[in-house]
Amino acid sequence: STASDYPGAFTDKEFVGTAYFARSTQLLAQAAQILGKEEDRKTYSELLSRIKQSFQKEFVTRNGRLSPNTQTAYVLALSFDLLPEDIRKDAAQRLADDVRKFGHITTGFLGTPEICNVLSDYGHDDEAYMLLFRKKFPSWLYPVTVGATTVWESWDAILPDGTFNKGSLNHFAYGAIGDWLFSRVAGIRQAEGSTAYKEIVIKPHFTTSLSFARATYYSMYGPISSHWQRTDTGLELHV
């Protein structure tokens, strides 16, 4: 059976809406800065500060837990920089603990793209790689075990017996794991303050689960390649 014994996680729309309100405002502030629109940058930066304060008041408990206490909640709060500095590490630990507890992803359309990024950024690479390599439902590799050659809309669009279940068989959403593969596994990341990958940082997150990783990103300034492999004496990284 593809069924999990997990009853389901629900992150309410008020939490998600506020998180994305903050993220949208953050992007506007960044765009204004890049375009040299100082008045707009200041306006959106001040709005972002107020949104963060309201978010923390409404959704962060006194002991640092989030309400709702779901993987998606922790992923969005950490990815969008919505938590006070002093509780971020603990929040990331709670996320990692939840992943370990259930052994699989419980995020939906909005939390899935960033969960492995957040885990890796806070030192929980083992949990991120665990999610990548899991072959039982729900996971990225379960579809491969039943012959998938595309990314599906739902984790179980085809059941183990080969019957069609639900959803599109060619859908972009879960392909978001590709960002983590490029930016954390291969380690190709844009430097802070840079635009269009003019300046880059190469910082792979190594694992004993892989013997090598290789990726190339074609930026407007030219191709950026990272290749690491395990050897008898350690690791080799070619950039």
Regions found by a protein language model. Give the residues of each.
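Non-catalytic C-terminal accessory modules of carbohydrate-active enzymes
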Residues: E46, D126-V239
